[in-house]
Amino acid sequence: GQSAQLFEKAFLAYQKVYEQFPDSGRVGDAVAKMAAFYYQKEDYSRAIDVFENVLSDHPDANFLDVILFNYGRCLYKLKRKPEARKRFEQLINDYPESEIASEANKIVKALKKAGF
């Protein structure tokens, strides 16, 4: 529908930001949006590729806490629960002040309880 087309346009715009300003702090924002696009389409593998690229190439990008959280969610959706737990733990350790750290903590506790 129309919202899907708008989303696609926005995605392309963010992709452009990512490609044109690879050293910018805005990369985190662009990457978070690109990955959200893939997540919404349930293309978790592509979202994971985007997350892995930003974590290796832009360790100082903005929104890394959100990126780690969503990375963990994608791994979880793909039944890669031990890896998902690692990402949530990384978020908790690296960004203890983040608003989503407590949510990540709940997920880690649940994963541990389930044996992951």
Set out the residue ranges of the language-model regions.
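Acidic, polar-rich low-complexity tracts and alpha-helical solenoid repeat scaffolds
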Residues: 1-116
